[in-house]
Every structure is written in structure tokens, then in C-alpha cells.
Regions:
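Vicinal oxygen chelate
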Residues: 1-7, 13-21, 45-46, 64-134, ...
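Core segments of cupin and vicinal oxygen chelate
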Residues: 10-11, 17-54
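Short low-complexity stretches enriched in small and charged residues
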Residues: 2-12, 27-33, 64, 74-76
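Residues in flexible loops and secondary-structure boundaries
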Residues: 19, 26-28, 43, 55, ...
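Short, flexible segments with low predicted structural confidence
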Residues: 1-3, 18-19, 58-59
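Intrinsic-disorder/low-complexity coil detector
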Residues: 8, 15, 37, 60, ...
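Conserved short beta-strand elements that form part of the metal-binding/catalytic scaffold
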Residues: 36-70, 116-122
Length: 134
């Protein structure tokens, strides 16, 4: 088989890894958001909900980001209004659902360790009035 016919590699999934100060606190917080943990120990955890996963490492003070720094993960969703309502009782929400100029609507929340999760959903063209894709 020639090089031009070889199967090209693909990127299949991404699992952002966040630093957390307390693993049990992180697991409890994300449990309120509907995540479950198929694996965790004192220093590392994998959490999942639907088709996404996140990973945690307990932070090492010697490797902390600069003060005021944070980590951000964008998560594409469906039925964003229902998800927002699920998260209202957690007290973690930092914004209402807002439409963007690029054809999405979304909201964001922050965990106890300054990790930010942005949830977004594409708005159908007929709803947004904004052409998508340029």
C-alpha cells in the first residue's frame, strides 16, 4: 500500500485534565453536575457524563498557575435550557444563557478550583438570524 493510500490518523476524543485542590470535594461538586467517576484514587480521577470525560489531578503547590489563572473547557451540548435548569440548584452558575454573534447560545460555571466550564449549543440559522459558516 502506498503512502498516499495509508489510513490517516484521526482525533477521536479529548479529555481536559484539571488541577483540583481536594479530590473528594471535586468529585462531590461534579457529582452535582451529573458526572460519575468510573475511576479515582487520591491523586487522579476520570469523570464522565454522556459522551464526554474530564480528568483531575490533585494540584501540587509547586506547579500552580499564576494567581488569577484558570483553566477553561468548552462543552458542546443539546437542550441547553434544560441543562441550565439542572445546574441552577448547584450555585455554580456564573452567567445566564446568552446568545453569541457566532450562532451559539451558552452559559458558564466555575468549580471550587477556578476551572471554568462553558456549555454551548448551536442555534439553528432560522432562530439566530445570523448566517453560520461565513
Amino acid at each position: 500500500m502506498s503512502a498516499s493510500h495509508e489510513r490517516q490518523p484521526t482525533l477521536d476524543a479529548v479529555a481536559p485534565r484539571f488541577l483540583v485542590g481536594d479530590m473528594e470535594q471535586a468529585l462531590a461538586f461534579y457529582g452535582q453536575l451529573g458526572f460519575t467517576s468510573p475511576y479515582h484514587d487520591e491523586g487522579f480521577a476520570i469523570i464522565e457524563r454522556d459522551r464526554i470525560s474530564l480528568q483531575f489531578n490533585v494540584s501540587d503547590p509547586a506547579h500552580e498557575p499564576p494567581e488569577g489563572g484558570c483553566r477553561v473547557c468548552y462543552i458542546s451540548v443539546t437542550n441547553i435550557e434544560a441543562l441550565y435548569q439542572q445546574y441552577v440548584p448547584t450555585g455554580a452558575l456564573r452567567s445566564p444563557i446568552q446568545a453569541t454573534s457566532w450562532g451559539t447560545k451558552g452559559f458558564w460555571l466555575c468549580d471550587p478550583f477556578r476551572n471554568i466550564l462553558i456549555f454551548g449549543e448551536s442555534i439553528p440559522e432560522e432562530e439566530s438570524g445570523t448566517p453560520q459558516g461565513g
